[in-house]
């Protein structure tokens, strides 16, 4: 009888759950014990092969028949014996074996349970098991493979398999197996010869079995990696050879192993569930934190918005308070104006203005009589002579300066002036002429008048009456703009104080309650100026003039006949500083000598732009005499009466006050010129100049502009040149000079004590250049001058000196 060694005839595989009990082994024992009696039925029965779930070869059938023949005498004793001599294997029991095996009656409950278990496995249903091991079964655990062997061999080989493959040390089982081995040794020689074939077969099967174990372990490890797929497939292969007496022990051991594996599986599932739960909790915590953060951010944004609203409301309230104060001040000014109109006697005052014109013989000072049909002006000769010989009555002095003087600026600018009417000492009584409506002297109250003055380049001149009595003194400036080009588009407001000066005042014989102010208008400007009230009317007079270096409009009362208004050719900006100046005019190229009266407050919103091109004229308005004359466009009104007056002196004339002015009238607001100390002489050029220096000329004369920096309490000096000369050598440095004129010394006339001092040198950069000076003494006047030094050591001419005040608006209002 030959056996195919490469094949596995003795290996029977069936599907079973992982928690299968020892009842299956009992079934297998019953099957092996009944093989001798039911050999024919088993060999011819077709359901036998499907029940074992294996492939039965002819060798296997022959081996089963041989086993049945060999073990036939001992069948009855084996059924009752506690330790059968057949190997124990797991296999589902067929239904017909339950009726043929007497030993199955003892294990009916277990057999029934296992039948249910097998039925549920085949139908892929997970019905609960009645056995204790079935209760521990995990529903997720799938069915595995269980390999069983039924070969008939010696107990020694079975012990080796049991110890090597299963690695379970069972002492009691080993003793029983030894007893069975002794019984096997007493068998017939045929049995020994027949057993030789299964022994050789078993060796081959054990080698194959070891390989299968490795494959199953690797496959089981691979299956366990599918934890995330919610599918677990357990494979358990057992090969147990023992007698029937060790069934309980083996059952307990297998159950223990299965429970351990199941516990590991449950712990794995529990760990996975716990990890998922932790992840969910973390996500929930993160979402909660984000919501809290968003809520906190929203709260902060709401607080910020509320604070912004509060700040906005506070700013609005402060602005409203300022507007209210301004309105109250305007109302008080209007009331004071009404009171002054009620108490002022009716008279007509003519204002005399002097214009600095060029040396052209066809243009001179002129008297303009308003051609309006109202009795605003009195052309009577006695009144004119009286006004000409007495002290000045009305003075208008500008406080706001701009950067764009002379005829090169735009003509559409205007300023708003405020006139403060203030009475002064009047030692004489007006008795030289009868007044129709009452000639008694009445004290004049203070009066604030907003008066828009259209000046060239935003620069207001000085209107001074030669007939004494009332003077306009600057009080404050509501807007002071940049010293270069910002004045072209802004309308600063100037405040004047109308103050009555001491001196003999003659009353007018006219009954018209008006003061006629002859207004100086630049060429091409507007011809009408709104009058502040019924008591003061402003008319304009124009004559064709030439661009002259007129720094201010001042009094010129050389003869009694020089009365009446004159038109200024172009009022010049005064020094670029925010000082209120009544400036006297000088020659075309000489430096103007402004004498400041007060300093207005510079607004915070003013902008200083030091990037103006060279086409801007210097601040003082001094230009070359070669400028072509500019003709004036006549206004639509009737032409004024012009009476020419001869100019005394040569082409250079400084405006002087009238000879009848009292000494008390010489105040800082007057237009008397202030003599400046001579500028330092330029040092001699180097004795030896390089050859290339002979082809170049000394540096050009710079043009200086001044501006105030209110926030830093400083003065900005900026300079440039009118037109760049290519023949001049490169400039190395600029030298800055200044001298400090005290206010009291200017009043006392101690100008000889003023000396120029060098305040520093600035490395030359591309023009225009600027620098800022700080740390000044309040209440003083400063004059500045700049000259250039080229790379060969030669000095150029000084610029026209510029002046500025360092004085507070309060002090100017008190002067």
Swiss-Prot record:
Compositionally biased residues, Low complexity: 34-46, 81-102, 121-133, 326-346, 375-385, 400-418, 662-676
Gene Ontology MF term list: transcription coregulator activity
Domain Fibronectin type-III as annotated: residue spans: 698-811
Biased composition, class Pro residues, residue ranges: 677-689
Compositionally biased region (Acidic residues): 208-219
Biased composition (Basic and acidic residues): 57-69, 155-170, 178-187
Keywords: Activator, Coiled coil, Nucleus, Phosphoprotein, Repressor, Transcription, Transcription regulation
GO annotation, biological process: DNA methylation-dependent constitutive heterochromatin formation; regulation of DNA-templated transcription
Positions carrying Phosphothreonine: 344
UniProt modified residues of type Phosphoserine: 125, 127, 628
Alphabetized InterPro entries for the sequence: ATF7-int, ATF7IP_BD, Fn3_ATF7IP, FN3_dom, FN3_sf, Ig-like_fold
Pfam families: ATF7IP_BD (PF16788), fn3_4 (PF16794)
Task of the protein: Recruiter that couples transcriptional factors to general transcription apparatus and thereby modulates transcription regulation and chromatin formation. Can both act as an activator or a repressor depending on the context. Mediates MBD1-dependent transcriptional repression, probably by recruiting complexes containing histone methyltransferase activity. May belong to a complex that represses transcription and couples DNA methylation and histone H3 'Lys-9' trimethylation (H3K9me3).
Identification of the protein by name: Activating transcription factor 7-interacting protein 1
């Amino acid at each position: 009888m030959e056996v195919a060694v490469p094949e596995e005839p003795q290996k029977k595989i069936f599907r079973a759950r992982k928690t299968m009990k020892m009842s299956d082994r009992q079934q297998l024992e019953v099957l092996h014990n009944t093989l001798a009696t039911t050999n024919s039925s088993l060999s011819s029965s077709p359901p036998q092969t499907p029940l074992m779930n294996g492939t039965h070869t002819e060798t296997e059938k022959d081996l089963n028949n041989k086993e049945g023949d060999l073990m036939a005498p001992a069948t009855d004793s084996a059924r009752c014996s506690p330790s059968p001599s057949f190997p124990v294997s797991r296999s589902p029991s067929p239904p017909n074996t339950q009726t043929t095996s007497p030993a199955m009656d003892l294990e009916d409950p277990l057999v029934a349970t296992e039948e249910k278990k097998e039925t549920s496995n085949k139908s892929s249903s997970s019905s609960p098991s009645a056995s204790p091991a079935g209760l521990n079964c995990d529903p997720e655990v799938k069915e595995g493979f269980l390999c069983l062997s039924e070969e008939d061999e010696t107990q020694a080989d079975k012990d080796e398999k049991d110890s090597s493959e299963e690695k379970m040390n069972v002492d009691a089982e080993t003793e029983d197996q030894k007893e069975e081995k002794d019984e096997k040794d007493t068998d017939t020689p045929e049995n020994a010869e027949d057993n030789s074939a299964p022994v050789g077969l078993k060796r081959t099967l054990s080698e194959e079995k070891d390989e299968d174990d490795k494959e199953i372990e690797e496959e089981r490890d691979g299956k366990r990696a599918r934890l995330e797929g919610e599918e677990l497939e357990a494979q358990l292969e057992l090969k147990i050879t023992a007698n029937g007496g060790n069934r309980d022990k083996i059952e307990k051991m297998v159950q223990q192993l299965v429970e351990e594996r199941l516990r590991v599986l449950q712990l794995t599932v529990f760990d996975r569930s716990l990890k998922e739960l932790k992840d969910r909790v973390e996500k929930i915590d993160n979402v909660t934190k984000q919501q809290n953060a968003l809520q906190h951010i929203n709260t902060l944004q709401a607080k910020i918005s509320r604070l912004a609203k509060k700040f906005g409301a506070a700013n609005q309230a402060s602005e409203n308070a300022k507007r209210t104060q301004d309105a109250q001040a305007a109302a008080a000014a209007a009331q004071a104006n009404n009171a002054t109109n009620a108490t002022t006697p009716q008279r007509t005052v003519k204002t005399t203005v002097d214009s600095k014109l060029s040396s052209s013989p066809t243009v001179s000072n002129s008297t303009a009589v308003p051609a309006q049909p109202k009795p605003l002006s009195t052309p009577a000769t006695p009144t004119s002579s009286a006004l000409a010989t007495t002290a000045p009555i009305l003075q208008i002095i500008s406080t706001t300066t701009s950067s764009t003087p002379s005829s090169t600026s735009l003509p559409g600018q205007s300023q708003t002036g405020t006139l403060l009417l203030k009475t002064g000492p009047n030692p004489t009584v007006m008795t030289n002429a009868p007044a129709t409506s009452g000639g008694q002297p009445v004290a004049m109250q203070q009066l604030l008048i907003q008066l828009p003055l259209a000046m060239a380049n935003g620069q207001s001149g000085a209107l001074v009456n030669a007939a004494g009595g009332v003077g306009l003194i600057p009080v404050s400036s509501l807007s002071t703009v940049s010293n270069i080009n910002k004045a072209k588009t802004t309308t600063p407001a100037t405040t004047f104080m109308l103050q009555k000066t001491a001196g003999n005042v003659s009353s007018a014989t006219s009954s018209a309650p008006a003061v006629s102010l002859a207004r100086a208008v630049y060429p091409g400007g507007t011809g009408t100026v709104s009058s502040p009230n019924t008591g003061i009317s402003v008319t304009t007079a124009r004559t064709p003039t030439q661009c002259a270096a007129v720094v201010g409009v001042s009094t010129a009362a050389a003869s009694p006949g020089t009365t009446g208004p004159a038109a200024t050719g172009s009022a010049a900006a005064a020094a670029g500083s925010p000082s209120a100046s009544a400036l006297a005019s000088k020659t075309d190229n000489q430096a103007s000598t402004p004498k400041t009266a007060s300093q207005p407050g510079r607004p915070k919103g003013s902008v200083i732009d030091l990037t103006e091109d060279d086409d801007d004229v210097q601040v003082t308005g001094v230009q070359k005499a070669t400028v072509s004359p500019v003709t004036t466009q006549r206004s639509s009104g009737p032409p004024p009466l012009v009476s020419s007056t001869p100019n005394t002196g040569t082409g250079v004339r400084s405006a002087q006050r009238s000879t009848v002015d009292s000494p008390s009238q010489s105040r800082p607001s007057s237009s008397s010129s202030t003599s400046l100390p001579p500028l330092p002489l330029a040092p001699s050029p180097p004795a030896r100049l390089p050859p290339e220096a002979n082809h170049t000329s000394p540096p050009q004369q710079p043009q200086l502009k001044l501006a105030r920096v209110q926030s830093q309490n400083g003065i900005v000096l900026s300079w440039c040149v009118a037109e760049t000369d290519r023949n001049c050598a490169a400039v190395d440095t600029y030298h800055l000079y200044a001298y400090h004129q005290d206010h009291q010394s200017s009043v006392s006339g101690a100008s000889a004590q003023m000396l120029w001092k060098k305040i520093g040198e600035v490395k030359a950069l591309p023009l225009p250049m600027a620098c800022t000076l700080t740390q000044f003494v309040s209440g003083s006047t400063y004059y500045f001058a700049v000259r250039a030094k080229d790379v060969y050591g030669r000095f150029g001419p000084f610029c026209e000196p510029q002046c500025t005040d360092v004085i507070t608006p309060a002090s100017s209002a008190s002067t």
